[in-house]
Amino acid sequence: MKSENYAVALVVLAGGKSARYKGNKLLSEHPISALSLIQHSVGEVVSARNDLALTSELPITVVTGKWHDSVNTQLKHSLCKVSELPISIVHNANWDEGLASSIRTGLTHLLSLSSLSKSVSPTAKGLCTRPTHVLFTLADLPSLNAQDFVHLINTSYANPNHIV
């Protein structure tokens, strides 16, 4: 999927407090992959990005909150080393303000990364450094897989002026 007019950034929201779970649910084991839920969720996003050969140099952004240290450790010791794609782990210090605060943190991070680039046009590799679209997903949705993300991104690509 290469287009000068379309570049999607991927943001995984992992900043909740897991109040009903009574602990860090993102470290619980995924029933199928046997990975921690955070490893599984980010892994599916990485797979979708790789499947589509997305046109963005931006890393996948993972926004953490209350459980930043343990989530950061899980990802640093697994997916970040395996994936050729960089993964940015960003701590939302205001996680207790709710989901909107994590979305804001993710967008602020994306804007800071893309502001380092002087143009919206693709690089020599044909990759965009500024997103035209952002896909947000929650880290605690164990049934979502790479194909679900591929479908959402393809639908967005086909309908770039609509929210998907």
Regions found by a protein language model. Name each.
Residues 10, 59-62, 89, 134, ...:
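Hydrophobic/aromatic residues located in beta-strands of well-ordered beta-sheets
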Residues 16-18, 67, 95, 139-142:
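Short glycine-rich anion-binding loops that position phosphate/pyrophosphate groups of nucleotides
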Residues 24, 56-57, 84-86, 160-161:
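A generic structural signal for alpha->beta connector loops
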Residues 2-69:
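N-terminal glycine-rich phosphate-binding loop and ensuing alpha1 helix
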Residues 97-164:
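Conserved beta-loop-beta/alpha segment of the NTase-like Rossmann-fold superfamily
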Residues 32, 47-56, 77-85, 111-130:
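Intrinsically disordered, low-complexity terminal tails and inter-domain linkers enriched
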Residues 83-97:
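Conserved donor nucleotide-binding strand/loop of the catalytic core
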Residues 69-77:
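Acidic helix N-cap motif at the loop->helix transition within catalytic regions
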